[in-house]
Amino acid sequence: EAVRYGEIYESSELEILAAFQAVKVPAVVLESAAVRRLYHLPETAANSPLRLYIPEERYYMARGYLFDLGYETDQFYTGFGEHMKRAGGFQVEIYHHLPFLTKNYKKHMKSLLDRAYPDKKYPVLKVLSLESSYMFRMAEACYHFCTDNLKIRELLDLYLFYKLFHKDMNKKFLDARIKELDISLLSQSLLHMADMWFSSRKDSLFPYPKDSISLYDDMEARILSNGTVGADSIPEAAR
């Protein structure tokens, strides 16, 4: 199924982006087929959707064009957007508001979108810089951890992104955004835990945390149980 999905992923994605360009529907690309390039074997990536942020005043127009392309809504995100799917299997998520409830997150995540720049091929659409794309993933992972909705695949995608690009990113920019979101300890802890999960001692990015292993045990329990067990060892996660 993953191989088959990969064959239609990029063509279906480009069909949507080209349609939005043709009818001048603006959008910011939050996640795309590029996630498959994080994996040594692209077919081992999840069958994840194209994710788009669309200004509220153009949202229903965009939604209508997706209906015309054969997409149907199979899940609503009340107050934020919806998940759509086509018979061939390709999925797209569209948002008119970013899916975060806290005031601080809304403010600073929106500022990431405001930094997006026009795509070279489809200039009516905007894309995130390398740093903003990483920050969106990290901030969303932290938010999902705090709301007990963090999936292992999401954490793996984040870790592979960091592993592949951390030397190319502007650390000063990342540190400033992490401080704004108040996720300094949580973001670092998620990366360290992912490193323990998804790497070997030989290719690990971080030293083994001998003195704080109980913290990672609690975090692991919380993720694997969707919050039914696992102490709040990180104060940031309780806010």
Predicted ranges, named:
Residues 1-48, 54-239:
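Conserved NTP-donor binding/palm subdomain of two-metal-ion nucleotidyltransferases/polymerases, i.e.
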